[in-house]
Amino acid sequence: MIEVQNVKLGTLISVFFFGMIGGTLRYLLSLKLASTGTILVNLIGSFCLAFLTYYVIERQKLPAWLSTGLGTGMVGAFTTFSTFTVDILGLSTFTDATFYLLISVVGGFLLAYTGMILGIKLGKVGDRR
């Protein structure tokens, strides 16, 4: 049995609850958009996690249980590396797979960077008030 020390029940419940939301959102998008949905959720998730980290969490605007629930639970369940990998393997040509990989990795990095910059800038604006 895995023993976890210093984990609060509220945090576990938060990760569970927000994980259900993130997983459900990903599932609904995948029904509508197939493999395009995987790229979309991973790109959106990259932005959201960076924004959460650099604005909400770093500024400690939310209690720890809520920021963990949103980041690890919702964004973690919303994004998916395993589906990303299976989608790449299912593409018919090397060119398609390469394009998918590049859009996902480069786009994810750029959106995470954008989320970070936006979070930092909004944090500085909020500090002036």
Swiss-Prot record:
Q: Which UniProt keywords apply?
A: Cell membrane, Ion channel, Ion transport, Membrane, Metal-binding, Sodium, Transmembrane, Transmembrane helix, Transport
Q: Does the keyword Transport apply?
A: yes
Question: Which terms does the UniProt entry file under GO BP?
Answer: cellular detoxification of fluoride
Binding residue positions for Na(+): G76, T79
Location, primary (coarse class): membrane
Task: List membrane-spanning regions.
Answer: 9-29, 37-57, 74-94, 100-120
Q: How does it sit in the membrane?
A: Multi-pass membrane protein
Q: Which GO terms describe its molecular function?
A: fluoride channel activity; metal ion binding
What PANTHER family does this protein's entry cite?
A: FLUORIDE EXPORT PROTEIN 1-RELATED
Subcellular localization(s) per the UniProt record = Cell membrane
GO cellular component terms, alphabetically, are:
plasma membrane
Q: Could you tell me what this protein is called?
A: Fluoride-specific ion channel FluC 2
Q: Which family does it belong to?
A: Belongs to the fluoride channel Fluc/FEX (TC 1.A.43) family.
So which residues are the signal peptide here? none
Q: How is its activity regulated?
A: Na(+) is not transported, but it plays an essential structural role and its presence is essential for fluoride channel function.
Origin organism of this chain? Ligilactobacillus salivarius (strain UCC118) (Lactobacillus salivarius)
Record carries keyword Mitochondrion: no
Any one Pfam family here would be CRCB
Catalytic activity of the protein: fluoride(in) = fluoride(out)
Briefly state the protein's biological role.
Fluoride-specific ion channel. Important for reducing fluoride concentration in the cell, thus reducing its toxicity.
